[in-house]
Amino acid sequence: MARRRLTKRQRERIAQVQEERRDRLARQALNASEGEEVHQGRVISRHGQHLLVQAVNGQQYHCLFRQNLGEIVCGDKVLWQPVADDQGVVVSLLPRNTVLSRPDYSGRDKPLAANITRLVVVLAPRPPPTGYLTDQYLIAAELIGVNALITLNKADLLSPDEWQAFQQEFSRYENIGYPVISVSAKKEHGLEPLLEHLKGQTSILVGQSGVGKSSLINAILPHRDEAVGALSETSGLGRHTTSVATLHFLDNGAEIIDSPGVRSFRLGKIDRRELETGFREFSPYLGKCRFSNCRHRNEPGCALIEAVEAGNIHPERLKNFLHMAEQLD
């Protein structure tokens, strides 16, 4: 059944009511006393100057925040004061354990999500994955200090032999300590390996368009639409809530941040030393080259090249590193 379209007058009235509500909350926020009791909470979502904050007891509050707090994002831990039954004001941003950022249109890093512990890299047979892009995701995980999980999706698209060959392509990542799992949203129990790895973690899914991230999110969060609808009703943000980052809680203790912006994540601006650090298996060889200014291309006595020749570093990983290093020069 088609949704009834609102008249211009009705839309204007709704906008007016929402504006009056925002103004009222803003006045209450400004009048909040510094001496009043504060509570700790978690940012479930943000849209503009509006936050949905979940208190320790699980109740959610619609909050504004003070301008001097900087950029607050989904997953942040905050201190807030109540100003009404279901409304409050955030007065302090607590220190972050981790923050995932990506460059904005001006090239500056823009925080997307905070306090994550796991980056789930989703790959699929189609579109064909590239080691170059996969390595960018893994570098991001290394630099912000979170665990990475490589998830091979859409197992149902290939025969058992083809799938085994596809899995074999990623054995080089298992050899350097990255867990690799296979999942399918269409198979019975096809999500169990992923759910097991998500337990006790705050995770974000990243990957190319078309690898099935949305299908996995919808399968993991079957009541996602209901949660987004409740957020829309609570926040007064209407349809805009479908495109904002949202923190979801699973029954097994897992937390997932669902965000279109995060899912299309790309690596931000880094320097050469950070790039080297992002390749974890390079660590034993850094600083061991014959020349201190070694570029790891064809210099004699290059420790990385010798490690490749000895089978300790996969040649494609060094190739991808050199390609990325060119972008920095």
Model-derived features: where do they sit?
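Canonical P-loop GTPase G-domain recognition
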Residues: L157-V211
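Catalytic P-loop NTPase motifs of RecA-like helicase/translocase cores
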Residues: P129, L158-S159, H189, R263-R266
